[in-house]
Design a protein with these regions (language model features):
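Short beta-strand/loop segment that forms part of the nucleotide-sugar
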Residues: 31-41, 62-65
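Conserved donor-nucleotide/metal-binding helix-loop-beta segment in metal-dependent transferases, i.e.
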Residues: 100-118
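A conserved acidic beta->alpha catalytic loop
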Residues: 39-49, 92-96
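C-terminal catalytic/acceptor-binding lobe
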Residues: 151-236
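Short aromatic/hydrophobic "clamp" motif used to bind/position activated sugar donors
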Residues: 88
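Short, well-formed alpha-helical segments that are part of the catalytic scaffolds
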Residues: 12-27
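Glycine-rich, basic loop-to-helix element that forms the pyrophosphate-binding segment
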Residues: 66-83
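Cell-envelope/extracellular polymer assembly enzymes that use nucleotide-activated donors
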Residues: 2-4, 34, 152
Length: 236
């Protein structure tokens, strides 16, 4: 079973520098893993930083070319859709892989994993089989750019009887404020309002047993590993 660790980022180089070393070491030591990093238009030097790191086995860096409205659910879908693993794991850029690979292999694809210690910033560590991701259509791209998207993802998986197991986070993540979370989003709506409105939509979909709310995905073109371009279509 191949595991894809999937990250999206915009202007978080200061945090990425703190987590990248251990995460790259993990990928290098664990065969049948890969790390997909999607840069959603960073202007803080991430592109040049990645270029200086050079080519790395099973590490895939994509930079968006025509994506101008940054939304976390859409960006998370980009990273997973560009990955190739049988098992996909959303890894926020301020988090460490830690011992996730061990637990995923122990539990197998029939069980999802999550680390639900919200206040410590590790709620975004969510994994499931690719089959399940495809069945529920990924993260809900109609959501406002932040708030409740991880909870919604897990709840929709549960609608089709896919179970999740809590796994501990071996290494503490880089702590964030809500201000940091939303500062690069293309919206004037505060986090609390987005969280509330997305929560209302989540409850409505669950009540109606809608486990796959996306009718189509967001299209996008990317530069891949500084060499060639690729494209994601909008089909589910």
């Amino acid at each position: 079973m191949t595991i894809s660790y999937c990250s999206q980022v915009k202007n978080r180089l200061y945090q990425f520098k703190q987590t990248v070393g251990l995460n790259l070491e993990h990928i290098a030591k664990n065969k049948n893993t890969e790390w997909v990093i999607v840069d959603c238009g960073s202007t803080d030097g991430l592109y040049n930083y990645m270029k200086k790191l050079g080519a790395m086995d099973r590490v895939h860096y994509y930079k968006t070319l025509n994506y101008n409205t940054y939304s976390i659910p859409v960006a998370k879908n980009f990273a997973i859709r560009l990955s190739s693993g049988d098992y996909v794991f959303n890894l926020d850029i301020d988090n460490y892989i830690g011992n996730a690979t061990y637990h995923i292999r122990r539990l197998g694809p029939e069980t999802g994993v999550c680390c639900n210690v919200f206040k410590k910033g590790v709620y975004g560590r969510i994994g499931c089989s690719r089959e399940i991701f495809n069945t529920i259509g990924g993260y809900d791209e109609s959501f406002l750019p932040a708030g409740k998207h991880d909870t919604d993802f897990i709840n929709r998986c549960k609608l089709i009887n896919y179970k999740f197991m809590h796994i501990p986070c071996k290494t503490s993540p880089i702590l964030n404020s809500k201000k940091e979370t939303i500062k690069n989003l293309d919206t004037n709506i505060d986090w609390e309002t987005m969280n509330k409105l997305n929560g209302m939509k989540m409850e409505k979909n669950i009540k109606k047993n809608i486990f796959c709310p996306n009718k189509k995905f967001t299209k996008c073109k990317f530069e891949y590993n500084f060499k060639k371009n690729t494209e994601l279509a909008g089909r589910i």
